[in-house]
Amino acid sequence: MVIHKTVKGYVILKNRNDTYDPPTSVSSNWKHWKATWDIKTCKGCKDMHGKIYAINEEPNPAPPLHPNCRCVVEPMDAVAVGVGTKDGTAGADWWLRNYGDLPSNYISEADLRSLGWDNGESPAKYIQGKMATMGEYLNKNGHLPQAPGRVWHEADVNYYSGKRNGHRIVWSNDGLIFVTYDHYRTFIEVT
């Protein structure tokens, strides 16, 4: 287990399963808002951090938000399908892109709850070899691209045992796929 100390002095324990750094390229489709995170970062900049825009879209508002703003909007990272998870061609990114569905090692939140699971508990305690698909992702902060009729869904990735990590895959009903390795703070396009 790795211990990280944050700016405010809180300690975050991160499981070894919580790290994944796949090779990436620059997205030709999307760009995102990027804030410099430190003790000087304002709430407005933090709230915008990670928001995704089409490559030809003009952000409104656009940085700088204030005289000392260090935010930028720049092309986001992209990862090739099959590399977005640790599972290669057996991974959720591969299956969603090629088959339009998750692989068989996924269990719905409802089925997981029927086994006795509750938030904060390890799914592996109730069923081995399965990852959770949590259903619709509401995109409450609006960071994922929005369009009329677009619905987002979410599922765990790179989870094998113990407490769930911060890795998720989100996909839309119209074919967009992104992964996050920091629990929705930032996203990477799956191409």
Residue spans for each PLM region:
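General secondary-structure propensity
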Residues: 57-58, 95, 175-177
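Intrinsically disordered, low-complexity regions enriched in Ser/Pro/Gly/Gln/His and often acidic
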Residues: 23-26, 87-88, 110, 145
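Alpha-helical interaction segments
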Residues: 20-23, 85, 107, 176-178
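Functional cores of ribonucleases/endoribonucleases
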Residues: 29-36, 43-46, 115-191
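Activation/maturation switch segments at domain boundaries
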Residues: 2-84
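N-terminal "domain-start" segment
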Residues: 79-128
